[in-house]
Amino acid sequence: MKIQIKGMKQLSNKEMQKIVGGKSSAYSLQMGATAIKQVKKLFKKWGW
């Protein structure tokens, strides 16, 4: 699974696991999705 955010390099599974803390899959995916939403909000705020 690769996730790409505008203008950022793709994140590998290992990097994603670090970001979401590598907890249980469902929890990690939920937290990952939440984190991505927050990041996208920040990017909008910064005009990216």
From Swiss-Prot:
Q: Which InterPro entries match?
A: Bacteriocin_signal_seq (IPR010133)
UniProt key word rRNA-binding: no
* One BP term from GO: defense response to bacterium
4Fe-4S: present as a keyword of the record? no
Which keywords does the record carry? Antibiotic, Antimicrobial, Bacteriocin
Top-level taxon of the source organism: Bacteria
Coiled-coil-forming residues are: none
Give residue ranges for the propeptide: 1-25
- Subunit-structure text: Active plantaricin A is composed of an alpha chain and a beta chain.
Stated role: This heat stable bacteriocin inhibits the growth of closely related Lactobacillus species. It may act as a pore-forming protein, creating a channel in the cell membrane through a 'barrel stave' mechanism.
Q: Which NCBIfam families does the record match to this protein?
A: bacteriocin_sig
Q: What name does the UniProt record give this protein?
A: Bacteriocin plantaricin-A
Species this protein is from: Lactiplantibacillus plantarum (strain ATCC BAA-793 / NCIMB 8826 / WCFS1)
